[in-house]
Amino acid sequence: MLRLTNIKLDLNHQPEALEQVVLERLNIAKQDLVEFTVFKRGYDARRKNNIILMYTLDVDTTKNKQLLSFFEKDQHIKQSPDTSYKFVAQAPEELKQRPVVIGMGPCGLFAGLLLAQMGFKPIVLERGKEVRERTKDTFGFWRKKILNTESNVQFGEGGAGTFSDGKLYSQVKDPKHYSRKVLNEFVEAGAPEEILFVSKPHIGTFKLVTMVEKMRAKIFELGGEVRFEQRVDDITIEDVDGNKRLSKLTLASGEVIETNYVAFAIGHSARDTFTL
């Protein structure tokens, strides 16, 4: 696979212009082009009367090796980097303990999803309600000033970002392309495919609710659990051979979960949990 960068086209170009520019840039016949995808699309608006689109394309041809050799000195034609996500582990066949994720905001949601995809069958605990019930409680506060302290704009499935405007960009460098995994999961859950390549991807609040539900369903399909209105009120830490080790979680309901593996994805507002 080849990566072509610095591809410039008019703002209102025709769809077929992309294929044509690939053929011209690589100097190949149409039958040698297998496929191409847009990896990134941005704007060059430095001249307001001549705004252009800037593309980065991933291209597969029948002559990849020959073309890489021929364009060896061209900085805008290189081999495409591997952007596939590499799981750090796979669960053993006999799982002695299930990991627990506390909180189901963005961090907890993806922690639960990735653990489930690796076969660890996680238990995700969320002190708030599932996203649609939580939406009712949140709008109840905004419109009627009725506050549910456990289900609001901060607590509940999806986290605080559920009621944001759904923008998906940051200033964080991502050399290993972890964000690609996130965006791919969003697309599988119903986000528009263009978030994979536009410079400032945006989903929108109303799509987020359905997407969060689909991602939760995926955790269940892979053997995990998601439990709502399950606040963690205490943790037990034991001394094992001179080392401190978490051993139990006690829920507000009184239930005790024995586990040595916990991801605290509690956001910035669960201050009662911070004090444990």
Where are these regions (language model features)?
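Residues forming the flavin
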Residues: 3-51, 57-276
